[in-house]
C-alpha cells in the first residue's frame, strides 16, 4: 500500500459536517466514512460505498476536478494543504474493483435499451442491471467509454480501466451492440417495437462547435474532439496554435507535445483559462505556452490572425481591438471550443425534440418528448464533466425504474 495514501488518510479530520462532501462533491460521496473504513483496513466496505454512490468511481478518481470539488472544500486547505482524497479514492476503487460483489436482482422480465456507452450510459446500465432489468447497450463505436475512451488522453485515463468495466458489465449480464448507430436505418421506435420498455439516450456531444471565422475549412485546421479520438493519424507539424482554454484544450496541447510538436500555444480570449488549475499547471510543466486576451480573427494559409482583447472603459468588458491584428504562423490550428450533440436520432425519430441550445429537450424527470425515452449527459447539457454526467444519470435511473414499475409492473417483456 502506498505510504502517501496512508498519510493522506491520517490527515483527515473526520469532520462532523464535512465540507468536502456537502459542498464539494457533486454526488455527495461519504468521504469521511470511506476514509474511516480505509484506516480500519475495511477496504472492500469502503469500495462498496464508493461504487454504490458512483459506479464510475475508478474513473472519477483520476479525471474529476478535485481541486475545486472535494479537495477544494477540505477544511485543512484553508490554512494549508487539503487532504488529497483523489489518491485515497483511486487506491481503494482501483484495488477493489474486481473484488466487488456486483450481483443483480432476479430478472423482472423487462428490457431496457441504453443508447451510448459513455459515462451516463455506463452508469444507467449498471444501476438498472443490478435491479433486474435486461439491459442492452447500443454503441456507435467498437468499444465502450464514449468521451472517456475517445476524448481523454491515455496519460490522464488509461483505456485499460474501461476494458475492465466492459468485462465486469458483461459478467453482470449486460449485452452490447458495438458499431451500431441508432438514427440511421434503425430508430428508437424500432426498439419499442421489439419489446424494450424504456430507452435511455446518452449519445454524448460529438459535433464540434465552429468558430465562425474565415478559413475554418482549410487543410491545416482541426477540431479537438476529432484529434483526441485518434491523434496518431494527424501530422500537426512543429508549431501548433490552439483556440480554446478548457480541459480539452489542455489535453490537445499536451498530446500534441507528446506526438512531437515543439511549439504549442493556447490562445485564451480572457485573462484566465477555463480548465482546472491542475490541468493548466500540468500543461505548463509539459511546455505549453499561453497567450491571454487574444481572439482569433481569421485563419490563413500561413497560420491564424489574432487581435488583442482590451478593456472597454465604459463597460469594463473585454472587446476586440482590430488595430492589433497580427499574423501568427502555425503549421496547424486546433479548435477546442466545446461540442454539441449530433442530430441523427432526431432526424429519424421525429417525436424527439431539441431545445434552443440544440440539445435534447427533457422534462424535470429526464424524460424526452417521446414517451418512455429518457436522456441525460452531454446529449442534454452539452459537454460537461464526467461526475456531472454520473450525478444526472443516477437520478435518471431512478426515474426510469419508477416509470417502468408504474406502467408495466413486473410484466414480462417477452
Where are these regions (language model features)?
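Ferredoxin-type iron-sulfur electron-transfer modules and their immediate structural context
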Residues: 1-111, 159, 196, 201-217, ...
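Residue-level detector of alpha-helix initiation sites
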Residues: 55, 118-119, 143, 246-248, ...
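Glycine-rich dinucleotide-binding loop and its adjacent helix/turn
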Residues: 89-106, 164-184, 207-259, 354-369
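N-terminal Rossmann-like FAD-binding beta1-loop-alpha1 element of flavoenzymes
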Residues: 110-135, 250-257
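Rossmann-like dinucleotide-binding cores of NAD(P)H-dependent redox enzymes
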Residues: 134-137, 141-172, 176, 253-298, ...
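A conserved short coil-to-beta-strand element within the FAD-binding core of flavoproteins
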Residues: 178-190, 293-303, 310
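AMP-binding/adenylate-forming core of the ANL superfamily
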Residues: 199, 303-305, 309, 325-335
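FAD-site-proximal beta/loop scaffold in flavoenzymes
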Residues: 217-237, 318-322, 328-383
